[in-house]
């Protein structure tokens, strides 16, 4: 399943450093507790990550792909044990 993930600057999420075009694995996936979270709809990610942080710096966003069967309890936020981080998305203007 393909989707989108938000990050703090530097592709950091919950103190974990991510990298483009890299696969990450965790031993367990449980919504809001364990695993790596993402949204299928890119606009849903904005419910969890603002475009601009309170300090004026932008958050980062990337395309992702779950390489296992993702879990969800609301069909909006998904959780995976094995997630491929694709390319970062940018806003050009």
Task: Locate each region found by the language model.
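Short, glycine-biased loop/turn motifs at secondary-structure junctions and
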Residues: 1-93
